[in-house]
Amino acid sequence: MGTFGIVALSIICSIAFLFVAYGVLRLINSIRRRNMMTADVSSVKSSQTWNFLKNPFSNSAKFEALDADDMWDTRVEEAELNTIPSASPFIDHTSETVPFVNTEAPPPRLSSSFSRQSGENAETQSQVSASPFNDKNSPYVQE
């Protein structure tokens, strides 16, 4: 058996050793997991480990859980408006009772063709006055 045979045998033995080591480590890991799952729940150590495996961030002070409402709520509180200098002109004019849209009923339509045209004109006038972009409907207009 020459040098080539010794090298080939050592490579085969090292690969076999890696397979055996991998199998032993998998077996140990599965036994450990099985023992952890069937361990007594009253055991403080196993329950802490299990809680950590369920949520690894639970003991971290940097992690703060947000529910869906907190995550998507982008409304600004009125108390926060007082701390924003750029919002100060709007604070005096904010009111939840001031609507953006004019809620008055449109004028009744007339039946003649001429009055129908004037009715359409009145309708566009009421649409303009009901627009939230019209200055007199804006709650932020300073009078």
Curated annotation (Swiss-Prot):
The chain crosses the membrane at residues 4-24. Residues 110-143 have a biased composition (Polar residues). Residues 97-143 are annotated as: Disordered. It is a single-pass membrane protein. Keywords: Golgi apparatus, Membrane, Transmembrane, Transmembrane helix. The keyword Transmembrane helix applies. It is found in: Golgi apparatus membrane. GO terms for cellular component: Golgi apparatus; Golgi membrane. It comes from the Eukaryota. Coiled coil: none annotated. This is Uncharacterized protein C607.07c.
